[in-house]
Each structure stands twice: as structure tokens, then as C-alpha cells.
């Protein structure tokens, strides 16, 4: 839910001749960012949010990403900075969205064997991020849950005509 190293990363990548991609793993409240419920209905241990990846496509996207992260801290903070679908509908221009890791709403539905819910959620995000800006994300981290999820994610992407992207659950130390 933060972009603390974004400017330094951008500068160093440019200096090295690498095209940087600025993004953030955001936390999405299951309902409104103003709802301070302590847990998701589907997983009381999850801390009240789902993960989602947002990547800036251009300067407008970077500015919207900054606005989303700021709103997460100022308006949606409940243990972590959280945003919601209303903010995503308002501030999605210039952003790509990836469906997220195992803690995403799509993957959590798959883990509960609720494929209809996974399809519904993916469809909602595909509408918000129209024009092929929503990607189904698969990862190869050798976890059994991920292997199961990947199988369903590939099928889901094909069924809904959504593009896919292979990633890894990366985080930084410094």
C-alpha cells in the first residue's frame, strides 16, 4: 500500500538505461474504504482486505496511482491503507490492473471453489479497467494453492477473453 521507493527506483532505472514500471500492491476493502470492519466475511484471518496490483501506464496513471495510495492512507486506513472500487472507478485512467496474488479477491474465491464469484469479480475489474487494462495474473511459486489457482486462472482468462501475465510475488527490502 505504499510507493516509498518509487522516485529513487525511477531515477536509478533511467540512469541504467532501463524503462521503469511504477506500480503498487494495493489493499482493496471488501466494501467501502470507510467501512472499518475487522475482517472479510470469507476469511476472518485476512485482516479485512484483498490484494491488487496497479501499474502506471503513463504520467496520468502515475498521478492517479499517487492519489489512490494517498486516499488509502487518508480515508481508508484500517490497520493498512485501503482503497475501494469507487476510487478505482474514479481514478483508473492510465493504470493497468493485475488480478493479484493468492490474497486477491479472485484467488480467494478460487480457493473457496467459488468459481462463479471469481468470474464475477474478474468481470467487475475488467469493466473498471476497460480496454485490455485488466490482466489475469499467474505466478509460479511452487505452492500447491498457487498451482490450483493457476489452473483456474488460465481457464477464467480464456472464458472471459482477458489477457494474462506471469509475475512473481515481489517485495523490496530497502
Regions found by a protein language model. Give the residues of each.
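Phosphodiester-processing cores and adjacent nucleic acid-binding clamps
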Residues: 1-174
Amino acid at each position: 500500500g505504499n510507493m516509498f521507493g518509487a522516485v529513487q527506483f525511477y531515477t536509478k532505472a533511467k540512469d541504467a538505461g532501463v524503462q521503469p514500471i511504477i506500480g503498487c500492491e494495493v489493499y482493496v476493502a471488501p466494501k467501502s474504504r470507510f467501512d472499518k470492519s475487522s475482517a472479510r466475511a470469507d476469511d476472518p484471518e485476512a485482516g479485512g482486505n484483498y490484494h491488487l496490483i496497479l501499474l502506471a501506464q503513463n504520467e496520468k496513471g502515475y498521478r492517479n496511482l499517487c492519489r489512490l495510495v494517498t486516499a488509502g492512507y487518508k480515508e481508508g486506513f484500517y490497520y493498512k491503507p485501503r482503497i475501494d472500487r469507487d476510487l478505482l472507478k474514479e481514478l483508473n485512467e492510465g493504470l493497468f490492473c493485475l488480478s493479484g496474488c493468492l490474497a486477491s479477491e479472485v484467488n480467494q474465491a478460487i480457493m473457496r471453489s467459488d468459481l462463479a464469484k471469481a468470474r464475477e469479480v474478474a468481470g467487475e475489474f475488467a469493466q473498471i479497467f476497460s480496454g485490455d487494462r485488466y490482466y489475469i495474473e499467474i505466478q509460479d511459486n511452487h505452492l500447491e494453492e498457487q498451482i490450483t489457482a493457476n489452473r483456474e486462472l488460465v481457464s477464467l482468462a480464456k472464458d472471459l477473453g482477458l489477457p494474462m501475465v506471469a509475475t512473481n510475488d515481489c517485495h523490496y527490502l530497502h
